[in-house]
């Protein structure tokens, strides 16, 4: 894959093999970001698990103390009094069969979907459509619930879902380039702490094998995983 001039120049400003302290790595990411938009800052953590085994799955949610910097559009499948609750809590779209029909027609103008348990008969039919896009409501992610008000407010405030992929890597946004380094570090620590708490009992050896932070358009800066784990025990 051919990289642009800015990407190549950014990679010359630091040692790609060095394992940096978390704060120093985030400072470097901010320094080398040159895009003309407010890039997302991401973290990618390789875990010492084998995702092929059910007892080594890592999945959950975490509320980032400083949010992600992105305004998320929340869609809610609900009926009865829960419709009003969702609207008052700030949901962008609320409905039932009407929303299902729009989605089946190719509409996806939302970032996260929430459903009350009594709407899963409707939502379940769209598993093959929503699932591959990461939009399917799921009890483990806290998006199938009757506690609509709290869930919407948490999602709007910066609650994110994470899940280990087939390569045993977990990916997450931890803010924007415009965030102060301390705010990014607080979000990184919150995410790392959540991952440590979610460690499967079956995981063996060093849990965090590698940690990389980057912005949307910049190369990754490596963080010493042992330092990050020690700071968030």
Curated annotation (Swiss-Prot):
Signal peptide region: none
Keyword match Ribosomal protein: yes
CDD domains recorded: Ribosomal_L1
Keyword Nucleus: no
Pfam families reported for this sequence: Ribosomal_L1
One annotated Gene Ontology cellular component of this protein: large ribosomal subunit
Name this polypeptide is given: Large ribosomal subunit protein uL1
Protein's organism: Syntrophomonas wolfei subsp. wolfei (strain DSM 2245B / Goettingen)
Taxonomic lineage of the native organism: Bacteria, Bacillati, Bacillota, Clostridia, Eubacteriales
């Amino acid at each position: 894959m051919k990289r642009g001039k800015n990407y190549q120049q950014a990679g010359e400003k630091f040692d790609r093999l060095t394992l940096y302290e978390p704060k120093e790595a985030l400072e470097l990411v901010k320094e080398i970001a040159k895009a003309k938009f407010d890039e997302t800052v991401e973290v990618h953590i390789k875990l010492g698990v084998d995702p092929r085994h059910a007892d080594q799955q890592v999945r959950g949610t975490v509320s980032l103390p400083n949010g992600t910097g992105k305004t998320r559009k929340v869609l809610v499948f609900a009926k009865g009094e829960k419709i009003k609750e969702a609207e008052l809590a700030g949901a962008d779209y609320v409905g039932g069969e009407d929303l299902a029909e729009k989605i089946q027609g190719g509409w996806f103008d939302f970032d996260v979907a929430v459903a009350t348990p009594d709407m899963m008969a409707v939502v379940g039919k769209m598993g093959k459509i929503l699932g591959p896009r990461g939009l399917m409501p799921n009890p483990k992610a806290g998006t199938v619930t009757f506690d609509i008000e709290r869930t919407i407010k948490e999602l709007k405030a910066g609650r994110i879902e994470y899940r280990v992929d087939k390569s045993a890597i977990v990916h997450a946004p931890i803010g924007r380039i415009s965030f102060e380094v301390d705010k990014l570090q607080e979000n990184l620590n919150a995410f790392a702490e959540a991952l440590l708490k979610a460690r499967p009992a079956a995981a063996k050896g060093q849990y965090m094998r590698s940690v990389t932070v980057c912005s949307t358009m910049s190369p990754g800066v490596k963080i010493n995983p042992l330092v990050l784990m020690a700071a968030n025990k």
